Amino acid sequence: MADLPETPAFGAAFSDEEEAARALEAGRWLFSQTCSFVMGCVSLDTLPDHDLSEIAFAGRSNVGKSSLVNALTGRKTLARTSNTPGRTQELNYFRLGPEAQDPALMMVDLPGYGFAEAPKDAVKRWTRLIMAYLRGRPALRRVCLLIDSRHGIKENDRDVMRMLDEAAVSYQIVLTKADKLKAAEITDVLARVVAETAKHVAAHPDVIVTSSQSGAGIDLLRAQLAALASP
């Protein structure tokens, strides 16, 4: 894979090398801990009751949400992956961290929105569930909004971004599948995404470029998410 571009949006996550080293080590430590599947939820009234911070992974169908969860945790089969758009149809909860000990996180792998190889009524049902969860979950600390780096931000992504802005829910753009692009292409899509993201009030300023295949950007994302863990 081509080297990731050195841009302010990609490299300004930490104020100095010492802070970066501490944050990266905290991320490495947390994501090396036990991570286990908790439950799959098909409605808001079945969401688990807990006191941990939640991090949700959202994006279009087949954008690589489950692959990213697996890459973050270093477990190839934690979240079920598929080449079939729409395979994930529940809100899948995973608990990350030492048992009965802080820090810890609850990660939520959401169904994809947009095109899916599933009945239309099922797609509508889980799309409503996704939007209701994103708007009204008190435990939700951040949404990682995954964007396929080959395609950039699409209109249904913009719909989600506007909804999160209106609900004042913090979200961070994570570009996926960067291994599919050349360095110049990555630089171009990153610049366009950073410029558009800057117009959204709830968007985190750092856009992270990742590849679940090569591991690029995974350490940085681990570090930023570990900072949100319940103390």
UniProtKB/Swiss-Prot annotation:
Superkingdom of the organism of origin: Bacteria
Example GO molecular function: GTP binding
Cofactor: Mg(2+)
Family affiliation: Belongs to the TRAFAC class TrmE-Era-EngA-EngB-Septin-like GTPase superfamily. EngB GTPase family.
UniProt keyword annotation of Electron transport present: no
Occurrences of domain EngB-type G (ranges): 51-231
GO BP annotation list: division septum assembly
PANTHER family xrefs: ENGB-TYPE G DOMAIN-CONTAINING PROTEIN, MSS1/TRME-RELATED GTP-BINDING PROTEIN
Recorded coiled-coil stretches: none
GO CC terms: cytosol
Any Pfam family hit: MMR_HSR1
Source organism of the structure: Rhodospirillum rubrum (strain ATCC 11170 / ATH 1.1.1 / DSM 467 / LMG 4362 / NCIMB 8255 / S1)
Taxonomic placement: Bacteria, Pseudomonadati, Pseudomonadota, Alphaproteobacteria, Rhodospirillales
UniProt KW keywords: Cell cycle, Cell division, GTP-binding, Magnesium, Metal-binding, Nucleotide-binding, Septation
Role description: Necessary for normal cell division and for the maintenance of normal septation.
Annotated GTP binding sites: 59-66, 86-90, 109-112, 176-179, 210-212
Binding site for Mg(2+): S66, T88
Oxidoreductase as UniProt keyword: no
Protein name: Probable GTP-binding protein EngB
